[in-house]
Amino acid sequence: MIAIAVDDEKLMLGALVAAIKASSDISEVSQFSNCDEALDYVKENAIDIAFLDINMRGMGGLALAEKIIEACPDCKIVFCTGYEEYAIPAF
């Protein structure tokens, strides 16, 4: 599986990527610290799964998820957040 990880906090992004790489099902993971770069990548490259922070500057994870699904309808989305108030709207 090919994955992307998107988080605007570098420390959290590093931890997320390390956790993803520990999965034997993920063969490749690309990391991005902003939504625009991630979306540009998805428009040019097929991915299987996207791990997204929800609360980011600019577009934000929820809006990015919608745009990823438009570009890659079969992509799975996993939201990663420490904010309880975002958990329900993410579904």
Question: Which residues are covered by each model-predicted region?
Answer:
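Conserved Asp/Asn-Gly motif in the active-site loop of CheY-like receiver
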Residues: 29-36
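Alpha-helical interaction/dimerization surfaces of two-component signaling modules
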Residues: 18-23, 41
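CheY-like receiver
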Residues: 39-91
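Conserved acidic segment of CheY-like receiver
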Residues: 1-11, 16, 20
